Amino acid sequence: MSTIQQLIRNTRQPIEDRTKSPALRGCPQRRGVCTRVYTTTPKKPNSALRKVARVRLTSGFEITAYIPGIGHNLQEHSVVLVRGGRVKDLPGVRYHIVRGTLDAVGVKDRKQGRSQYGVKKPK
């Protein structure tokens, strides 16, 4: 415990809360260019080939972002929009690519939960 004299000398510092998506620099989304598009395997009880991309953001960061949905058209030099949001079973993946914007097309034949995948309402 601090003495009153110590508290007069220098006050208590508030605890700074760290952001979960530092590469976005406080913005809701950031634009970036894919440098590598590949698949990776998830952590222990799960098994799959998850689609991810290495993205160089306009903020200067190089991050790993998850590509949601079934099938995608992304390749090297594709321009994408990145939002926050981690993938629990992929260590180090703290960002999602926004489908239906810039070079990332929406998910084909998706009928339900379309908003997250950039799909217009079917006629």
Curated annotation (Swiss-Prot):
Annotated GO CC locations: chloroplast; small ribosomal subunit
Localization of this protein: Plastid, Chloroplast
Family membership: Belongs to the universal ribosomal protein uS12 family.
Single Gene Ontology BP annotation: translation
Quaternary assembly: Part of the 30S ribosomal subunit.
Gene Ontology MF, one: structural constituent of ribosome
SUPFAM superfamilies for the chain: Nucleic acid-binding proteins
Pfam family, one: Ribosom_S12_S23
Protein name: Small ribosomal subunit protein uS12cz/uS12cy
Keywords: Chloroplast, Plastid, Ribonucleoprotein, Ribosomal protein, RNA-binding, rRNA-binding
Keyword Transmembrane: no
Function noted in UniProt: With S4 and S5 plays an important role in translational accuracy. Located at the interface of the 30S and 50S subunits.
HAMAP family in the cross-refs: Ribosomal_uS12_B (MF_00403_B)
